[in-house]
A protein has these predicted regions:
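Flexible, compositionally biased loop and terminal segments
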Residues: 2-121
Length: 121
């Protein structure tokens, strides 16, 4: 998931607005992959290099992750999507880790698309 910040800059938006638009695109991709019965989808969400971004942007990205998990949990259930996270989550703040764990737990018995989020990879 690269280029959201550059896209926003080209359009005259803030970087976080670009990331929010990226969430909308990801939602469409996940829906399509589920619809055509793709079994695994891995989204490279937040790399180790992303920790070098300005603190304000990192906080915005983590808040966007939490909001997206909250907003999409019913859709994940409805569409039988199982959430999995790969990466080193030790750097993620405890609140965000808890929300990730809750979403994983909620979808653990789903057996459709397996959605892997690579975070801090």
């Amino acid at each position: 998931m690269d280029g959201n910040g550059r896209w926003a800059k080209q359009k005259g938006f803030s970087r976080i607005e670009g990331h929010k638009e990226g969430v909308n695109t990801v939602r469409e991709i996940i829906s399509y992959c589920s619809k055509i019965k793709i079994k695994y989808l891995t989204l490279f969400t937040f790399s180790e290099e992303n920790w070098n971004r300005p603190k304000k942007e990192i906080i915005g990205l983590m808040n966007l992750l939490v909001k997206s998990l909250k907003d999409e949990k019913n859709s994940l259930q409805k569409n039988n999507i199982k959430l999995s996270v790969i990466g080193d989550l030790k750097k993620i703040d405890p609140y965000t880790r808890k929300k990730i764990a809750n979403a994983i737990s909620l979808t653990k018995n789903n057996d459709g698309l397996i959605l892997n989020l690579a975070i801090s990879y």
